[in-house]
From Swiss-Prot:
Enzyme Commission numbers on file: 1.3.8.5
Pathway assigned to this chain's UniProt record: Lipid metabolism; mitochondrial fatty acid beta-oxidation; Amino-acid degradation; L-isoleucine degradation
Record-listed N6-succinyllysine modification sites: 70, 278, 284
Upper classification of the organism: Eukaryota, Metazoa, Chordata, Craniata, Vertebrata
Cofactor(s) required, per the database record: FAD
InterPro entries: Acyl-CoA_DH_CS, Acyl-CoA_Oxase/DH_mid-dom, Acyl-CoA_Oxase/DH_mid-dom_sf, AcylCo_DH-like_C, AcylCo_DH/oxidase_C, AcylCoA_DH/ox_N, AcylCoA_DH/ox_N_sf, AcylCoA_DH/oxidase_NM_dom_sf
Single biological process term from Gene Ontology: acyl-CoA metabolic process
Name recorded for this polypeptide: Short/branched chain specific acyl-CoA dehydrogenase, mitochondrial
PROSITE patterns noted in UniProt: ACYL_COA_DH_1 (PS00072), ACYL_COA_DH_2 (PS00073)
Similarity comment: Belongs to the acyl-CoA dehydrogenase family.
Gene3D superfamilies: Acyl-CoA dehydrogenase/oxidase, N-terminal domain, Butyryl-CoA Dehydrogenase, subunit A, domain 2, Butyryl-CoA Dehydrogenase, subunit A, domain 3
Quaternary context: Homotetramer.
Domain of life (superkingdom): Eukaryota
Binding residues for substrate: 183, 229, 283, 291-294
Length: 432
């Protein structure tokens, strides 16, 4: 098994037309916004409390960020266009994520994990999304939802059985949504009826991410529909379980390399030992994991938007029209300044929410704010970048239009934008 870079550190296409030289099809942008680059945390010489800027990172966080950036540029970027076109995640990318230790970021070392921080997960997701949002989502769900559900709610036996595989080779899938239970996720109809030492699952799930490659499915089903959401329980279902079927992948607009499938359960027998946590507590686990997961999606949208912005700015600084750079037109400068400001605000919202999680402080409102705002800014940023690049940005020869397509999902999954606004308003009402 390959050792992650962080663990080692701890131990010791031709252009069809003539365009500015900075523009190269499906390549990593040569320049990035300086203000988006973090600085290492400096040691204070006095006893004062350190109130460091939110973008100030520890040496470990800097190392993680640099490692992921290198991995994304060298191993993901060359495959992004083909994965999008073929709607398929390359196995080499999945294997690379495991080999780099990026699929067990917070998992304890005793289970083979990297044992880093939640904030490190956010940095990893952001860096991957600068290159491909689909790969970032793969890493996001595995870390912020699947692994953390096990870390917080699994029995010691379940942790010992599943976590070592989840951090090295096995993908997990979070199965909550149904055809009639999207934003109202607790209106689910999937049932789990007791039968001896087993529960028998019947029903279906929709819009399930990574179902095509996942080997372990965390399925939420109701053991007592008469109790409403208080009967919802989380079951561990292996891919090869009899009666469990995975449907065809959806032909999506964006994040096409990330599979999304329907699941069907026909008298699927699951042993009692495969219940995650307590019976009837599934709704608590789902809410808790999604609250943290929304910060991951905020990081994905932030990285996606920043990656698109970084790709576009060098072009408009070299593209000449009317005898001068198009960047020199004041109208365009104002648009660029507005987008850059919104990106910075997104980064601060996202980082702040992540730091709140690490500090053990309330973060639900801030997570919703980060997810909502990051999704809106990603849509605006990618749209503007296409406009700034003109016809070039509208073609599939360059990644800007893909960033635009990928961005739209941010306002939909893991809590639509209106749901985030509801959550924010609910907290404001309580605070006043």
């Amino acid at each position: 098994m390959a050792v992650s870079a962080l663990q080692l550190w701890r131990m010791g296409g031709l252009l069809r037309r003539r365009f500015p030289t900075c523009l190269s099809p499906w390549k990593i942008p040569p320049r990035v916004l300086k203000s988006s680059q973090p600085e290492a945390l400096v040691s204070l010489t006095n006893n004062a409390v350190a109130f460091a800027p939110l973008q100030t990172l520890t040496d470990e966080e800097i190392m993680m960020k640099q490692t992921v950036k290198k991995f994304a540029q060298e191993h993901v970027a060359p495959l992004v266009s083909s994965m999008d076109e073929n709607s398929k995640m390359e196995k080499s990318v999945i294997q690379g994520l495991f080999q780099q230790g990026l699929m067990g970021i917070e998992v304890e070392a005793q289970y083979g994990g990297t044992e880093a921080s939640f904030f490190c997960s956010v940095l990893v997701i952001e860096e991957l999304a600068k290159v491909d949002a689909s790969v970032a989502l793969l890493c996001d769900i595995q870390n912020t939802i699947i692994n953390n559900l096990f870390r917080k709610h699994a029995s010691e036996e379940q942790k010992a059985t599943y976590l070592p595989k989840l951090v090295t080779e096995k993908l997990g899938s979070f199965c909550l949504s149904e055809a009639g239970a999207g934003s109202d996720s607790f209106a689910m109809k999937t049932r789990a009826d007791k039968s001896g030492n087993y529960y028998v699952l019947n029903g279906s799930k929709m819009w399930i991410s990574h179902a095509e490659h996942a080997e372990l499915f965390l399925v939420f089903a109701n053991v007592d529909p008469s109790s409403g959401y208080r009967g919802i329980t989380c079951f561990l279902v292996d891919r090869d379980t009899e009666g469990f079927q995975i449907g065809k992948r959806e032909n999506k607009m964006g994040i096409r390399a990330s599979s999304t499938c329907q699941l069907t359960f026909e008298n699927v027998k699951v042993p009692e030992t495969n219940i995650l946590g307590k019976i009837g507590h599934g709704y608590k686990y789902a809410i808790g994991s999604l609250n943290e997961g929304r910060i991951g999606i905020a990081a994905q949208m932030l990285g996606l938007a920043q990656g698109c912005f970084d790709y576009t700015i060098p072009y408009i600084k070299e593209r000449m029209q009317f005898g001068k750079r198009i960047f020199d037109f004041q109208g365009l400068q104002h648009q660029v300044a507005q987008v850059a400001t919104q990106l910075e605000a997104t980064r601060l919202l996202t980082y702040n929410a992540a730091r709140l999680v690490e500090a053990g402080r309330p973060f639900i409102k801030e997570a919703s704010m980060a997810k909502y705002y990051a999704s809106e800014v990603a849509g605006l940023t990618t749209s503007k970048c296409i406009e700034w690049m003109g016809g070039v940005g509208y073609t599939k020869d360059y990644p800007v239009e893909k960033f635009f397509r990928d961005a739209k999902i941010g306002t939909i999954y893991e809590g639509a934008s209106n749901i985030q606004l509801n959550t924010i308003a609910k907290h404001i009402d309580a605070e006043y």
